[in-house]
Structure formats: C-alpha cells, structure tokens
Amino acid sequence: MSAGEISTPQEYIGHHLNNLQLDLRTFELVNPHDGPASFWTLNIDSMFFSVVLGLIFLALFRKVAKNATSGVPGKFQTAVELIIGFVDGSVRDMYHGKSKLIAPLALTIFVWVFLMNLMDLVPIDFLPYIAEHWMGLPALRVVPSADVNITLSMALGVFILILFYSIKMKGVGGFVKELTLQPFNHPVFIPVNLILEGVSLLSKPVSLGLRLFGNMYAGELIFILIAGLLPWWSQWLLNVPWAIFHILIITLQAFIFMVLTIVYLSMASEEH
C-alpha cells in the first residue's frame, strides 16, 4: 500500500507503524500489507539508523578529541565537555566498583540512546516519503528506540555485562551462592531462592528494554495520530507543544537507561 492508496486515518497510522523488513530465508523485502511476517525477519530500517547514529556519535566525539584545545573551547567542544563531565560525575556517584570501562560505556549509552530518541522529532512523513517515492521501499520507520528488538538487544548487552561482572567479582561459586542462598540462607530454600533471584535477575534487562521502548513508541504514536487525524493546517497546534515536551522525554529516557545500567553494574560489582 503506497501513500497514495491510503484513504483512512487507520490505514495511515498502520502504514507508519510498519518496519522495513528483510526476510532472512529469501533475502527479499517483506511487503507489510501481505499479512504478518514470519519470525525470520530483520527490521533493516532500525538496524540502519542505529548503526548510522552510532557512527555519527563516534565521528563527532573523535573530531572533538582530535581538535580539543587548552584555550577557549568552541561551542561544540564545550557541549561535549559538559556531557562528558555530567556522565563522569554520574558514574562516580553511583558506581563503586574498580572497572574503568563503566564511564565510557555510560557515555556511549547516553549519547547513542539520545540520538536514537531524537529521530522522533523528524517530521513523520519526511523520510518515509523519500524512501517510498525515490527509493521504492514499501515502508520505513526512523526511530530505532521505538522498535522493541533494538531496545531489548541493548538491554541484553547490559545483562551480559551484569553476568560478567558478577562472576568476575564473586567467582562462579559466589555467583551460584548468591542465586541459591539468598534471601533465605538454608539449603531447603534453594528452589525458592533460585526462583526469586532468577526472576529478579531477568527482570532487569526486560524492564530496561521495555521501559525505553514503551515511552518512545508512545511518543511516536502520538505524532502519527496528530498527523493522521487532523487536517494539515491545524497539526502544528498540537505538534509544536508535544515536540517541545517530547524533548524532555527524549533526554530523560536516555538518562534513565544510562543510570539503570550504571546501578545494575555497580550492584554486580559488589563483593559479598
């Protein structure tokens, strides 16, 4: 279904919630209007924008690092230094382990998630129109953090780090004891402890990923609803206030994802 064939607000909303998908069995693009896609599909628009935004982050910060001066810094260098100082201060306050990798990790998470969230402010029809009419693509979504696959993948990476630091600091035996002998320190309660600690451990990445996805999906959906239900000449009455408020949400969600990552890794690095 092309934009020209969309005749109702429901079709418009559904069209903008479809990802550009690749069928991994046939390596062909999936037509979102042919029915539900199979499990073996890849949301290549989410992957593309995630990688591009990550490369932009690396390029910009590398440029600042190479051109940094000890004199009066420029505006962009000042902004980067403020971000680095803010993230470094947050890590110092919340992380009590010895690893020196947490601050760079926190900086990467904060800026990368912020850039992905920032794509929500791109006009809702701009890039999809270009993709459809100039490139012949059936669909396009430009907000990677509104794709649950992206947010849960990032959360899975954090979860792997939690396991790594837990085993590194406590040893395999200490990690197993933590799962089986807490909160009830008696062998008879090992099954209960394992269930409680297992649920607690698994809930960290799940809640981390779903929280970011839910907030960004809701924000994207509101922009789509405004564009799909209101005439073009009145959309700015709601779009502008929501966009201004959404800037706060974009920044806050990146900050929350970073803070929870730091806290979880700090807990994992504690020696018992």
From Swiss-Prot:
Its main location: membrane. The keyword Transport applies. It is a multi-pass membrane protein. The keyword Cytoplasm does not apply. It comes from the Bacteria. Keywords: ATP synthesis, Cell inner membrane, Cell membrane, CF(0), Hydrogen ion transport, Ion transport, Membrane, Transmembrane, Transmembrane helix, Transport. Pfam families: ATP-synt_A. GO terms for cellular component: plasma membrane; proton-transporting ATP synthase complex. It is found in: Cell inner membrane. One of its GO terms (biological process) is proton motive force-driven plasma membrane ATP synthesis. GO terms for molecular function: proton-transporting ATP synthase activity, rotational mechanism. Gene3D superfamilies: ATP synthase, F0 complex, subunit A. The chain crosses the membrane at residues 41-61, 102-122, 147-167, 212-232, 243-263. InterPro entries: ATP_syn_F0_a_bact/chloroplast, ATP_synth_F0_asu, ATP_synth_F0_asu_AS, F0_ATP_A_sf. Key component of the proton channel; it plays a direct role in the translocation of protons across the membrane. Belongs to the ATPase A chain family. NCBIfam families: ATP_synt_6_or_A, PRK05815.1-1. F-type ATPases have 2 components, CF(1) - the catalytic core - and CF(0) - the membrane proton channel. CF(1) has five subunits: alpha(3), beta(3), gamma(1), delta(1), epsilon(1). CF(0) has three main subunits: a(1), b(2) and c(9-12). The alpha and beta chains form an alternating ring which encloses part of the gamma chain. CF(1) is attached to CF(0) by a central stalk formed by the gamma and epsilon chains, while a peripheral stalk is formed by the delta and b chains. HAMAP family: ATP_synth_a_bact. This is ATP synthase subunit a. The lineage of its organism: Bacteria, Pseudomonadati, Pseudomonadota, Gammaproteobacteria, Enterobacterales.
